[in-house]
Amino acid sequence: MQTPVSVNEKKDFIRWFLNHYQLKRRECVWILNYLMSHDSLMEKVHFVEQAEFCPRGIIMSTHCVDEVPFRFYKENVMTTDAEKSFHDIRLNKQQDLFIQLNFRSAYSSPEYAAVLESNPHLPKDLFENKQDQGMAEKILEHAISTFQREKLLKDIDEALDRHDKETFEKLSRQLNQLT
């Protein structure tokens, strides 16, 4: 599950997310667009759960959920001021930034599962039941695998439609490696 997520995968996910959901605070859209426009920043972005445990974390929520609209955590300080967080992001480009997105169907979204990383800053005693944690990781791995397979099949179909033999063969090899 700890396969690094590429900058392009993160950008594709943000584009998909912004096209399908409306964030409660417009500043969140500005922050995500700013991050997307700088590859060096995107390398430092990690989509996680429970970002409040991270040294530098942002929580953003959409209109379709009953969660806080926006929170920025830095060390032990929390603010709801999006402009302060934007300023911090610009000034500290070399620091990792952990983003938690709260939106409807987040846990059943293969798009989100494909970029979601394990939060390395979670307290060790947070999970009471190791069996539940293991089951959750297996479900997430299955969702990621299913998403990757479906995306490859779609891309293979498009390559066939274009009569692009080289791309078809490349994607077919990738699909065979998945299975």
From Swiss-Prot:
It comes from the Bacteria. InterPro entries: IDEAL_dom, UPF0302, UPF0302_N, UPF0302_N_sf, Virus_scaffolding_prot_C. Belongs to the UPF0302 family. This is UPF0302 protein RBAM_020740. It comes from Bacillus velezensis (strain DSM 23117 / BGSC 10A6 / LMG 26770 / FZB42).
